């Protein structure tokens, strides 16, 4: 307050010092989720450690990438499965995506590969079996929990230890974000996830949107059946997903309104899309040499993400065929079997510096599975996309980018070699794609605070204030008929009907009186004339 009006640099320093001093160190519990989810959550955790907070990460001892070289206390618990089990189940899951795509809750529920989810759900049971660990957590008196809600465990931990929580997610499956945050999502223009609809839906799509919402209400709890059983067991009371999610203090959502469509939000939702974008670093020699050799045509970067390792052979050959028909050099991150028809402009690599390559001016296009990390790297660097979504939020991400003219979406199951070739030629040669993604890029980057700083601020806010109850809407305390004001509407309707009824009765009475008089007069008149 005292700083306003001062313009010399010295008071500015004082102000900065004051704001720094405000961030007193606290104690934070982190419950992460494995896989690509951890990539960005990790950057927030690292920054919180750097800022001097005492951070404890609780993770299963079997994992792909959790924990690695974090400079903080890491507590592991033993799991009921091995790394081989995890790999095998994930492979089965990824493999199934090449056969049929999940476009409804029903197909999600009926998926024959859902064992992977049950492995993740079982983590929490394992955590709470470790009595020493639970005792340690209880005695540590944390200020808050920072969690990825995917496997529910962080939500259960927050509730069990009665700690305020910060949820970190791209989105929440089913209707649990709307329910947990009490956020309205009108079905007329807010598409449900998995459908791949835009916000301008046809009548048929709006009908499908409603049915999807109904499916969520009817079927989602069955998808989370095992997770909820474990939660009820740990919390020793029957719990629903709503019970778990509605405990959340702050929602850190990895999206923004450059990627997503505008829609209603709540005051405890913070949008940190693009948190994974980094300043491009110089390229390793190997990749610089590929770019130098590509000449005036430049390069195309191709990656289906860290989670897809193998593509069915026929599909891989169709893709390789299309890649050979463009003049650009294609750098393809692929660890599966080398397609026999691979053209000489296509280079297979086991790994590539994706963000740095996308940041290079010679990069013409990005072929991606449209995972949110890749899409944001594309937005940040302004590279048009050819998108081949496979599962999760990817169909939706792709649709959003396509409707904004920043890329072309292909149905990976049905596309032919020509489709891919045409899509590539379109995004490379049609200037509008580049212009649109550059526009999105400048909109996305025009912001007062970097997403990483925003995320760190809100975690610290919850730690400082032991939650954010002032942001919690009173909607949580209402019954469903109160929320929709059905009782008020019913009451008012009753009043109006009663008034209408009484008025009608009075009029009818009055009318009858008048008529009666007239009638008698008439009658009297008649009898006189007789
Ligand atoms: C880890 O943190 C400690 C103190 O918090 C610091 O002294 C040390 O340099 C850090 N190590 C790394 C590898 O960052
Ligand atoms: C690529 O070209 C640039 C500019 O011509 C040059 O400075 C660089 O050394 C080249 N890199 C490689 C690996 O050939
Ligand atoms: C790639 O193959 C085509 C014919 O298939 C040939 O014309 C071209 O010279 C080859 N390029 C390189 C760099 O070997």
Curated annotation (Swiss-Prot):
Swiss-Prot/TrEMBL keywords: Endoplasmic reticulum, Glycoprotein, Glycosyltransferase, Lipid metabolism, Membrane, Signal, Transferase, Transmembrane, Transmembrane helix
Main location: endoplasmic reticulum
Leader sequence segment: 1-25
Domain of life: Eukaryota
PROSITE patterns (UniProt xref): UDPGT
Subcellular location: Endoplasmic reticulum membrane
Modified residues (N6-succinyllysine): 99
EC number: 2.4.1.17
Membrane topology: Single-pass membrane protein
Transmembrane residue ranges: 488-504
GO molecular function list: enzyme binding; enzyme inhibitor activity; glucuronosyltransferase activity; identical protein binding; protein heterodimerization activity; protein homodimerization activity; retinoic acid binding
GO biological process terms, semicolon-separated: flavone metabolic process; flavonoid metabolic process; liver development; negative regulation of fatty acid metabolic process; retinoic acid metabolic process; xenobiotic metabolic process
Catalytic activity, reaction form: glucuronate acceptor + UDP-alpha-D-glucuronate = acceptor beta-D-glucuronoside + UDP + H(+); 2-hydroxy-17beta-estradiol + UDP-alpha-D-glucuronate = 2-hydroxy-17beta-estradiol 3-O-(beta-D-glucuronate) + UDP + H(+); 4-hydroxy-17beta-estradiol + UDP-alpha-D-glucuronate = 17beta-estradiol 4-O-(beta-D-glucuronate) + UDP + H(+); 2-hydroxyestrone + UDP-alpha-D-glucuronate = 2-hydroxyestrone 3-O-(beta-D-glucuronate) + UDP + H(+)
Classification via Gene3D superfamilies: Glycogen Phosphorylase B
Assembly and oligomerization: Homodimer. Homooligomer. Interacts with UGT1A1, UGT1A3, UGT1A4, UGT1A6, UGT1A7, UGT1A8 and UGT1A10 to form heterodimers. Isoform 1 interacts with isoform 2/i2 suggesting that oligomerization is involved in negative regulation of transferase activity by isoform 2. Isoform 1 also interacts with respective i2 isoforms of UGT1A1, UGT1A3, UGT1A4, UGT1A6, UGT1A7, UGT1A8 and UGT1A10.
Note from the entry: UGT1A9 isoform is part of the UGT1A complex locus which displays alternative use of promoters, first exons and terminal exons. The locus is defined by 13 first exons, which are alternatively spliced to 3 other common exons and 2 alternative terminal exons 5. From the 27 possible mRNA isoforms, 9 produce functionally active polypeptides (UGT1A1, 1A3, 1A4, 1A5, 1A6, 1A7, 1A8, 1A9 and 1A10) called isoforms 1 (i1). Use of an alternative exon 5 (5b) as terminal exon is leading to 9 additional alternatively spliced products termed isoforms i2 and which lack transferase activity.
Family: Belongs to the UDP-glycosyltransferase family.
Protein name per its UniProtKB record: UDP-glucuronosyltransferase 1A9
Organism of provenance: Homo sapiens
Lineage: Eukaryota, Metazoa, Chordata, Craniata, Vertebrata
The gene coding this protein: UGT1A9
């Amino acid at each position: 307050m005292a700083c306003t009006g001062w313009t010399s640099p010295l008071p500015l320093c004082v102000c900065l010092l004051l704001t720094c001093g405000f961030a007193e160190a606290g104690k934070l519990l982190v419950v992460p989720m494995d896989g690509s989810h951890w990539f960005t959550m990790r950057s927030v955790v690292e920054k919180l450690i750097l800022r001097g907070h005492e951070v404890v990460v609780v993770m299963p001892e079997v994992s792909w990438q959790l924990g690695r070289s974090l400079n903080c206390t890491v507590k592991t618990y033993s799991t009921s499965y091995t790394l081989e089990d995890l790999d095998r189940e994930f492979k089965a899951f990824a493999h199934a995506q090449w056969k049929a795509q999940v476009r409804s809750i029903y197909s999600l529920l009926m998926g024959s590969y859902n064992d992977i989810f049950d492995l993740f759900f079982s983590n929490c049971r394992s955590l709470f079996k470790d009595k020493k660990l639970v005792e340690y957590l209880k005695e540590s008196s944390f200020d808050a929990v920072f969690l990825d809600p995917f496997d529910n465990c962080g939500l259960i931990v927050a509730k069990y230890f009665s700690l305020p929580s910060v949820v970190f997610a791209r989105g929440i499956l089913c209707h649990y974000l709307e329910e947990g945050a009490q956020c309205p999502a009108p079905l007329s223009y807010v598409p449900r996830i998995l459908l791949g609809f835009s916000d301008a839906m046809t009548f048929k799509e709006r009908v499908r949107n409603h049915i999807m919402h109904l499916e969520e209400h009817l079927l989602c709890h069955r998808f989370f059946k095992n997770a909820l059983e474990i939660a009820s067991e740990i919390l020793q009371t029957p719990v629903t997903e709503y019970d778990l999610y509605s405990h959340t203090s702050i929602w850190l959502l990895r999206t923004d309104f450059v990627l997503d469509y505008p829609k209603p939000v709540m005051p405890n939702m913070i949008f940190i899309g693009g948190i994974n974008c980094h300043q491009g670093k110089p390229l390793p020699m190997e990749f610089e040499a590929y770019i130098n050799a590509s000449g005036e045509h430049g390069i195309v970067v191709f990656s289906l993400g860290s989670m897809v390792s193998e593509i069915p052979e026929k599909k891989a050959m169709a893709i390789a065929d299309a890649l050979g028909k463009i003049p650009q050099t294609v750098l393809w991150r692929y660890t599966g079997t080398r397609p026999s028809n691979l053209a000489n402009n296509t280079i297979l690599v086991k790994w590539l510096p994706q963000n740095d390559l996308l940041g290079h001016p010679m990069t013409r296009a990005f072929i991606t599975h449209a995972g949110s990390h890749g899409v944001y790297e594309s937005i940040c660097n302004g590279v048009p996309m050819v998108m081949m979504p496979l599962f999760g939020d990817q169909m939706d991400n792709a649709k959003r980018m396509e409707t904004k003219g920043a890329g072309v979406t292909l149905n990976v199951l049905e596309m032919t070699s020509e489709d891919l070739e045409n899509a590539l030629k379109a995004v490379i040669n049609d200037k509008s794609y580049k212009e649109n993604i550059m526009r999105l890029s400048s909109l996305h980057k025009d912001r007062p605070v970097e997403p990483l700083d925003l995320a760190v601020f809100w975690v610290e806010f919850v730690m400082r204030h032991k939650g954010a109850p002032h942001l919690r809407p009173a909607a949580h305390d209402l019954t469903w008929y109160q929320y929709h004001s059905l009782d008020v509407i019913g009451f008012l309707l009753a009043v109006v009907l009663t008034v209408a009824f009484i008025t009608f009765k009075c009029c009818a009475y009055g009318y009858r009186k008048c008529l009666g008089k007239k009638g008698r007069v008439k009658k009297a008149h008649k009898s006189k004339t007789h």
